[in-house]
Amino acid sequence: MQMIDKRLLNKKVIVTGGSRGIGAGIVKRLVNEGAEIIIADIEEEQAKKLIEDLNTKKINFVKTNLSEEDEIIKLFEFAKNHWGTVDILVNNAGIEDGFTLSNQSYEKYRNTMKVNLDAPFLCSKYALPLLEKSKSGRIIMISSIQGIRGYKGNISYNTAKGGLINMTRVLAVELAEKNILVNSVAPGFINTNMSIMKDGNLEWDTDWFKDVYLKYEKLPMARYGNPDDVAGAVFFFCSEDSKYVTGQTLLVDGGVSATF
């Protein structure tokens, strides 16, 4: 059995999009490390099930439509009233669209950008006064390997994830004097609901994936990752082990980026 040292004991953490997938993996890891968590998500039933499964009183759920600024403001008002401070913000929430330039409507483009890029900006902005009260404030962005490479057919998602990586750098420089560290994690192929394609097939079961990534050794570890793999990287940035690290992006991708 893995021994947990509770290295985040009583740390106050907000995880956006924490009800499922990578977000749920992050919540599980951080609560096991002793953190108190607010899940900000629109998926209420999934969040409640996660809290029930973890059997803990250290998690609160705030139903939040992260595409709406007023709901983000209410989220941080709740955090202020409930805790008075925030130690760690994990900007994890994201949606994927799968459209190319020619078939992407501006409305759908903007909707993806609102959740994937605007929301991390707004959450970071409204978290700032609470993070300043912490002696070890952290902002962690969940980007993607798609934010550092060209990838056909996902224009708004890729653009937003690339923007998150540069937002990480900018905020790291801007907030260093406030002792707030800002880093990002860029997952590769992770086994979540977002890896299910429109036709219902898993991405890594398709012929094109096998040809491009396995046959030509573009995925050196030859397997997909799991939310726990990403959660471990997030924990590093939450912990004192990263106290002299800011403005960095850690790729959790099984070696894909090493083949670029």
Predicted features by range, described:
Residues 102, 149-155, 177-178, 222, ...:
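Active-site loop immediately N-terminal to the catalytic Tyr-X3-Lys motif
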Residues 100-101, 105-110, 215:
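Substrate-binding pocket helix/loop in short-chain dehydrogenase/reductase
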Residues 8-36:
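Canonical Rossmann dinucleotide-binding motif of NAD(H)/NADP(H)-dependent dehydrogenases/reductases
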Residues 129, 173-177, 243:
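Alpha-helical segment proximal to the catalytic Tyr-Lys
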Residues 124, 160, 168:
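Active-site helix of classical SDR
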Residues 144:
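Residue(s) in the substrate-gating loop at a strand-loop-helix junction
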